[in-house]
């Protein structure tokens, strides 16, 4: 069979194809690696790269362009960079660092790039958020007015925290800073608060322990853990808090309440110092770079209570900072104190004396939270701080005086019982009605008949007694948020009956 080829037809088909051809040109911004090491790469070329833009190396490692100099670009690596070689090519991606976000992140442990590290498979994501995004402006905010209960009597009564506040937790190592933060997360169960715990430069074993606590206590279902351990590259330790903030913002802008804990910002500052010094940026005080204040301020300003127009979502931040030998006047502590709305100061001396949580009530303050305290708490806790302050003065004086008058002795005895009342075991947060009952008992002298070592046992028994035999007391406090006369009468009855019962048992 002979095929008859028509040259005209073929010619017209070719002409048609040529007409329909769209020439495509892809312009890629390419550079060459000059030098690599210590998590830093110096790159020649990349002329049009932006500050903070992601760059991709031949082996797939991603970096962030931070130093844009006249003849080279300094990039920090998000990985070990062991397979990057001198002379290799680098491509500018045209993107700024962003992470996937969705509700599926709840209950998961992720790294600073929001990739899962808990071995439970990929996390489905619906959208992306920039890791660094600008904080809400003045018009987008409203003042803090709702309480965020931590479950710790000392904090909720005297250093209250409101939703949308930034409250610093500061103290030496091993003074229970993480315990205060994790107890606050445990206390959010059933409160419709999404929690984000960011672990920066911690031991992997410590992070695993915290995750286990959350899982055992049913707190992991409303919590996201972002972790970059001590062996992670400095770049990822520096990014982790911003990733946590981006995850919390996703929920905040969807009209939900969020709580974020940065544990701790001293390690983030150290990672940033390492990066800056390797990039040859000029060092400042304590060898930190000049913009270390901005590093923390732009992070903590993202915590806010949003306006009614934006749905009244909130993001409460509890940054943790470690001090050396109680020195609050070092560079990073003073910076973060000036950015936050108050601080909870944990003292090693109190911790070693068995007063836990080791909160130094004298120098801890909340500059916002008192506006967010419920009325019932304001009614009973007003006298508490004053009595404890007077007790601290008297105690110092009583060390030198031998014969004290009866009034002073009574005041000292009351102070010791109040201090006992503030002690709490770890992972045992108290509901607000239990706190109100506890403080009322102490401030009104109902503990004076007991020995100091009996106080803790009695209070546990009293709280159980109120919950079982006077359930309406808790209902009144929860529903009205006020310590009414009816509630007071119920509580007085419960204290009287419980004290009689307790003293009988002790005999």
Curated annotation (Swiss-Prot):
HAMAP family: ATP_synth_alpha_bact (MF_01346)
CDD domains attached to this UniProt entry: ATP-synt_F1_alpha_C, ATP-synt_F1_alpha_N, F1-ATPase_alpha_CD
Organism field: Adiantum capillus-veneris (Maidenhair fern)
Quaternary structure note: F-type ATPases have 2 components, CF(1) - the catalytic core - and CF(0) - the membrane proton channel. CF(1) has five subunits: alpha(3), beta(3), gamma(1), delta(1), epsilon(1). CF(0) has four main subunits: a, b, b' and c.
Membrane topology per record: Peripheral membrane protein
Principal subcellular localisation of the protein: plastid
Record bears the keyword Transcription: no
Protein name as catalogued: ATP synthase subunit alpha, chloroplastic
Keywords, ordered alphabetically: ATP synthesis, ATP-binding, CF(1), Chloroplast, Hydrogen ion transport, Ion transport, Membrane, Nucleotide-binding, Plastid, Thylakoid, Translocase, Transport
EC number(s) per entry: 7.1.2.2
A GO term from the CC aspect: proton-transporting ATP synthase complex
């Amino acid at each position: 069979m002979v095929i008859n080829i028509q040259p005209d037809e073929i010619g017209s088909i070719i002409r048609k194809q040529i007409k329909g051809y769209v020439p495509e040109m892809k312009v890629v911004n390419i550079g060459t690696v000059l030098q690599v090491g210590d998590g830093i790469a110096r790159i020649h070329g990349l002329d049009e790269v932006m500050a903070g833009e992601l760059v991709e190396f031949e082996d797939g490692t991603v970096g962030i362009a931070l130093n844009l100099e006249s003849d080279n670009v300094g990039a920090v690596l998000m990985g070990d960079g062991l397979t990057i070689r001198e002379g290799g090519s680098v491509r500018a991606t045209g993107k700024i660092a962003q992470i996937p976000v969705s509700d599926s992140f709840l209950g998961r442990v992720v790294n600073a790039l929001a990739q899962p590290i808990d071995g439970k498979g990929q996390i489905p994501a619906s959208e992306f958020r920039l890791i660094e995004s600008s904080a809400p402006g003045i018009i987008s905010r409203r003042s803090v007015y709702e309480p965020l209960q931590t479950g710790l009597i000392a904090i909720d009564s005297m250093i209250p925290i409101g939703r949308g506040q930034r409250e610093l937790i500061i103290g030496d190592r091993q003074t229970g800073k993480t315990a205060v933060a994790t107890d606050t997360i445990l206390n959010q169960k059933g409160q419709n608060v999404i929690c984000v715990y960011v672990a920066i430069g911690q031991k992997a074993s410590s992070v695993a322990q915290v995750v286990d606590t959350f899982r055992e206590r049913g707190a992991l279902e409303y919590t996201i853990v972002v972790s970059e351990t001590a062996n992670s590259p400095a770049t990822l330790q520096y990014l982790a808090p911003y990733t946590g903030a981006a995850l919390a913002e996703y929920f905040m802008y969807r009209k939900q309440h969020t709580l974020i804990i940065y544990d701790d910002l001293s390690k983030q500052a150290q990672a940033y110092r390492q990066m800056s010094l390797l990039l040859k940026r000029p060092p400042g005080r304590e060898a930190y770079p000049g913009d270390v204040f901005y590093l923390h301020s732009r992070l903590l300003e993202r915590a806010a209570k949003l306006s009614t127009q934006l749905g009244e979502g909130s993001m409460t931040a509890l940054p943790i900072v470690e001090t050396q030998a109680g020195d609050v006047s070092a560079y990073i502590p003073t910076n973060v104190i000036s950015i936050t709305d108050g601080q909870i100061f944990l003292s090693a001396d109190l911790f070693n004396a068995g007063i836990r949580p080791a909160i130094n009530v004298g120098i801890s303050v909340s500059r916002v939270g008192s506006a967010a305290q419920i009325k019932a708490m304001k009614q009973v806790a007003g006298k508490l701080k004053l009595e404890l302050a007077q007790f601290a003065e008297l105690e110092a004086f009583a060390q030198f005086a031998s014969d004290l008058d009866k009034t002073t002795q009574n005041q000292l005895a009351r102070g010791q019982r109040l201090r006992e009342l503030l002690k709490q075991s770890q992972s045992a947060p108290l509901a607000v009605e239990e706190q109100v009952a506890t403080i009322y008992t102490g401030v009104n002298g109902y503990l004076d008949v007991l020995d100091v070592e009996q106080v803790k046992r009695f209070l546990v028994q009293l709280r159980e007694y109120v919950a079982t035999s006077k359930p309406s007391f808790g209902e009144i406090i929860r529903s009205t948020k006020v310590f009414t006369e009816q509630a007071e009468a119920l509580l007085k009855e419960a204290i009287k009956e419980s004290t009689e019962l307790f003293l009988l048992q002790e005999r």
